[in-house]
């Protein structure tokens, strides 16, 4: 419920028209409906959290509250980056850690707390979720440029059109020669353009600079960090099967989005 709250507000702020292959709430209804629906989901999420066992309630609510604040901070950074041309790789990784990764990390740690895990195992699960969350967002950046819209569930090139300072754009700006840098800046500063032309031009520069492979390499790096954290959790390997299946669903989005989303939901429900 909380995750859907963030998506409703995120789509509104980004003016995204499609989510999971369907029109977004503010497109079907209006902006006010999207804001109020998202707010209601946030309230419901906190209400559900109060159903935790009393002995864990304070620790769970503290972590959940911190997570929600961090996600707001990440979204604010994401919006600020759109008007900046000097965003660094480290700043971007920190932004996606806050905006995306801490939600998965916090969810896993809350589950560990409620299951009576040791503090060390709970922290290892948190780190597992955080690293997978970063890898997932890097993959999301990649799919926004190179994905199939039928599989991705969103229009391709949205990040390019709104000048999102993604890992790919940051790397391209750092690696570009004088001519490529000027071309990128021309598109970043253009006020009137054909969307398809801008997407094609920026993607071509990414291709020239091997940005796709660079992004995939960084994604695999965080995937490796995540699996190392999962390996450190002191439970039998067969008990980690569902988490490994979840990782496969998140990191290999090759099936239809609706089916992948359903399987991910079922996996989380049975953890």
Protein language model features and the residues they cover:
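Mobile late-domain/C-terminal helix-loop "cap" segments
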Residues: 176, 182-233
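Alpha-helical structural elements of signaling/regulatory helical domains
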Residues: 55-56, 116-120, 175-179, 193-194, ...
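Conserved small/polar residues in nucleotide/adenosyl-binding loops
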Residues: 260-270
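Short, amphipathic C-terminal "tail helix"
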Residues: 222, 238-258
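Hydrophobic, well-ordered secondary-structure elements that form the walls
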Residues: 169, 226, 243
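Alpha-helical, largely C-terminal catalytic domains
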Residues: 103, 218, 233, 256-258
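Generic leucine side-chain signal with a strong bias for well-ordered alpha-helical environments
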Residues: 7-8, 230, 243, 268-271
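Mg2+-dependent prenyl diphosphate-binding active-site environment of isoprenoid biosynthetic enzymes
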Residues: 1-181, 185, 221, 248-251
């Amino acid at each position: 419920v909380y995750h859907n709250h963030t998506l409703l507000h995120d789509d509104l702020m980004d003016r995204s028209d499609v989510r999971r292959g369907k029109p977004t709430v503010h497109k079907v209804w209006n902006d006010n409906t999207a804001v109020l629906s998202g707010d209601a989901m946030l309230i419901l999420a906190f209400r559900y959290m109060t159903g935790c066992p009393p002995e864990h309630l304070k620790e769970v609510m503290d972590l959940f509250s911190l997570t929600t604040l961090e996600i707001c901070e990440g979204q604010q950074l994401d919006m600020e980056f759109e008007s900046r041309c000097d965003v660094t790789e480290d700043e971007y990784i920190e932004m996606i850690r806050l905006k995306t990764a801490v939600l998965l990390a916090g969810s896993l740690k809350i589950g560990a707390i409620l299951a009576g895990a040791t503090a060390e195992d709970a922290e290892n699960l948190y780190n597992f979720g955080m690293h997978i969350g970063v890898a997932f967002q890097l993959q999301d950046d990649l799919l926004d440029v190179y994905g199939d819209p039928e599989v991705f569930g969103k229009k391709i090139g949205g990040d390019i059109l709104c000048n999102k300072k993604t890992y790919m754009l940051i790397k391209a700006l750092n690696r570009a020669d004088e001519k490529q840098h000027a071309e990128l800046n021309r598109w970043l500063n253009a006020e009137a353009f054909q969307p398809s032309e801008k997407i094609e031009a920026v993607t071509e520069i990414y291709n020239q600079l091997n940005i796709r492979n660079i992004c995939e390499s960084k994604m695999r790096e965080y995937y490796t960090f995540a699996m190392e954290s999962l390996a450190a959790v002191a439970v039998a390997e067969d008990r980690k099967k569902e988490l490994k299946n979840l990782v496969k669903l998140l990191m290999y989005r090759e099936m239809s989005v609706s089916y992948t989303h359903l399987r991910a939901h079922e996996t989380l429900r049975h953890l």
